[in-house]
Amino acid sequence: MTVSRRTLLGLALLPLGCDPGKPHEGFLGLTERLNDRMQRALFRPGKLAPEEPAGALTPKGEFPLYKVADDYSAAPAGWKLRVHGLVARPLDLSLADLRRLTPTQFRVRHHCVEGWSAVASWQGVRVSEIARLCGADPRARFVEFRSFERGYPNADASPVRYYSSWDRESVEHPQTILAYGRNGAPMSREEGAPLRLYSAVKLGYKMVKWVDEVVFQPVRTGGYWENLGYEWFAGV
């Protein structure tokens, strides 16, 4: 899966004379920025994705679970979620701490950039609740979610951390959560345990698995796939 994405991206960039390592330069970068602006203009923070019926759940084993590392990542000993950046109160939250916060759940259709979709139920805490707890500064218009997963975006490069940056409006959408459960059961390692980002308003590659850091920041950064030319906003 990872190889095919990189291969297709490289082939797409060759006719444009663009460097796959510098997706924000040249014609491709201009097109992507215009697309992001259009998607942000169309985004409605209060609009919810429709709840799918219970019978629509995709059977276990038929919901693809992607990774960029050689194996599914295991949480390091003493794992905690670190929340920092432009915040009044930096946080270090254990899974037990997160479970004590007001829970939310929804059953929605997941959309992948490859064209497939699937339905799952997700349980967790809204990222807007985390923003409230840490006192996120209004100047932090972007949020970066970081994973302890490491992958190889380029064959000749060192492993890099999986991450994705988001616009603050999408982060605080009521269907954007840090999920610790799926389909009524605790999140499995393959699904992103102990904690993964999930949202009904973004494409799948924006939903970082194995999250260990949330950073509120004033500037937009990139992401593991975004740095390879994938859309930054990636709205559904």
Model-derived regions: residue spans:
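N-terminal secretory signal peptides and thylakoid transit peptides that target proteins
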Residues: 1-16
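Structured, non-membrane catalytic/scaffold regions adjacent to prosthetic-group chemistry
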Residues: 20-236
